[in-house]
């Protein structure tokens, strides 16, 4: 009889523990929901301002009619809140806004990333930004704007950029040249740091091709003088 009483007591204690656990779980769920709603409100407060700041930069980057917007999709609570934040991209006037990741080209993505990084420069702690041919498919004037934005970002963080445009390369604080060579049947890539004279030669080559003339050298010197 005593053993039966002890077992019954243990069962009651387990039920009591379960009730306490459920109580704590309900409390935690309530706190999670409250925090999620607070985060949602803050995101909605900043979304329009953020997208507007990004959109003001797009014309200079060769996308005059494009628009970036944010959409919030309610989902089950997770580490980043109770919403999924979707970036929507409208490439030109009259186009339907679609998911950025599935719509924008590689070159557009790099330029959009540059616009986002510039718009959020004060609040973004990322120490290193990498842009792979953000100038793909654009001309000199847009390339100049891209280079100037990257140079501005480079004042507060490290910015690495792969580029084929002299207007972008001339804006860099430091320039490197990547060379490929073959040795013993294998291909190697070498990275060469360029000094001032090397930069003049390389930018002149980017301007004029294989044959570098006095005119292209003078143009390269002028571009380096005019950087930020």
Range-by-range predicted roles:
Residues 1-61, 65:
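Extended, charged alpha-helical coiled-coil/arm scaffolds that mediate oligomerization and mechanical coupling
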Residues 44, 48, 123-124, 136-144:
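Conserved D-loop-proximal element of ABC-family nucleotide-binding domains
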Residues 59-85:
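Long, charged, glycine-rich C-terminal linkers/tails
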Residues 70-74, 89-93, 116-118, 180, ...:
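Flexible glycine-/small-residue-rich
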Residues 87, 91-94, 107-129, 153:
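GG-anchored amphipathic helix commonly corresponding to the ABC/SMC/Rad50 NBD signature/C-loop
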Residues 132-133:
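Walker B catalytic acidic pair
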Residues 141-228:
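C-terminal lobe/lid and adjacent interdomain/linker elements of RecA-like ASCE P-loop ATPase modules
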